[in-house]
Amino acid sequence: MTLVSFFSFLSKPLIMLLSNSSWRLSQPSFLLVGIPGLEESQHWIALPLGILYLLALVGNVTILFIIWMDPSLHQSMYLFLSMLAAIDLVLASSTAPKALAVLLVHAHEIGYIVCLIQMFFIHAFSSMESGVLVAMALDRYVAICHPLHHSTILHPGVIGRIGMVVLVRGLLLLIPFPILLGTLIFCQATIIGHAYCEHMAVVKLACSETTVNRAYGLTMALLVIGLDVLAIGVSYAHILQAVLKVPGSEARLKAFSTCGSHICVILVFYVPGIFSFLTHRFGHHVPHHVHVLLATRYLLMPPALNPLVYGVKTQQIRQRVLRVFTQKD
C-alpha cells in the first residue's frame, strides 16, 4: 500500500463522518499565517523545514526498504523500527507539504474539513509514535532482563497485536478532536497563527464554549504522554537494575549500548514535544513565533532524525545501508 493510498484509506471514514448533515459545514475556510511576525523571513525558514522533510522521506523509506528486503532483520527490534518509520512518514507528510506551501508560495487557505483531518492525522500519529516507543522499551526490557525467552515472548504474533493496539489507541483516543471541533461556531476571524492546523490554535478561534475541547485536549496529552513516559521509565529502571548486576564493565557497556539508539529517539521525541506543549499552554511571555517554530520543527525533527540515529548507532542497519549504496551492480 502506497503512502497516498494509506492516507486515502484512513481519511475516507473521517470525511464521511465530517460530511454528516448535522455538522456545521457552512464554516468558512481557515487561513494559515505561517510564522507570525517573521513573514519576511519565511522563505529562509522553509529551507530547514524542507531539508528535514526530505531527510524524513529518504531516511524512513530506506529503513523500511532495508528491513523489508532482509529476512534476517525480521526480528522484534527491527519490526518495531519499521512501524516507527511508517508512522514518521505519515506524520511528516501530514505537516510538511502544507507548511512549505504556506511559507514558500503563500498558499494560506485550507478548507474546514481538510484542516480537521490534518489535525487528526498529526495528533493520532503522534500518539502512535509514542506507543511504538513504549513497545520498543518493552522489547529492550525483555531482551536484557529475559534474554532466553525473548523470541518466545515477542514472537511475530505478539508484535502484530502490539502494533494493532498502538494503531487502534491512536485512532480511538484522537477521533474526538475533530468531532468536538465540529460542534464549535467560528463567527469571527478564522486566521490560524500557525503553519498547520494546531488543535489549541483552532480552538481559540471559536466564539462558542470550548471548555470540553480544552479539557479533552489536556487530558489526552497528560494521559498518553504521562502513561507512556511512565511505562518507558519503569522498563528502563528494570533494565538499569539488571545491567548493574552484570559482572564486568565491558559487558555492562555492551548491554547499555543496545539501548543507546532507543534512548536517543526517546529524547528526540519527548523533550521537544513536552517543551512545546508547556510553552504553548503556560508560556504566555514567550513570543508567539517561538511557539510556532517549536511546534512545527517538533513534528519534523523526530521523523528526520530517527533514521539517522538508528543508521549511526545500529550496526546491522548501518552495514546494510552501506551495502545498498556501495553495490556495483
Swiss-Prot record:
Disulphide bridges: 115-207
UniProt keyword terms in alphabetical order: Cell membrane, Disulfide bond, G-protein coupled receptor, Glycoprotein, Membrane, Olfaction, Receptor, Sensory transduction, Transducer, Transmembrane, Transmembrane helix
Organism: Homo sapiens (Human)
Lineage per the UniProt record: Eukaryota, Metazoa, Chordata, Craniata, Vertebrata
The protein's name in its UniProt record: Olfactory receptor 52L1
InterPro entries noted in UniProt: GPCR_Rhodpsn, GPCR_Rhodpsn_7TM, Olfact_rcpt, OR51/52/56-like
Role this protein plays: Odorant receptor.
Recorded GO CC terms: plasma membrane
Keyword Membrane tagged: yes
Residues of this chain annotated as glycosylated in UniProt: 20
Entry's localization field: Cell membrane
Cytoplasmic side: 65-72, 139-157, 236-255, 313-329
Lipid bilayer topology: Multi-pass membrane protein
A molecular function GO annotation: olfactory receptor activity
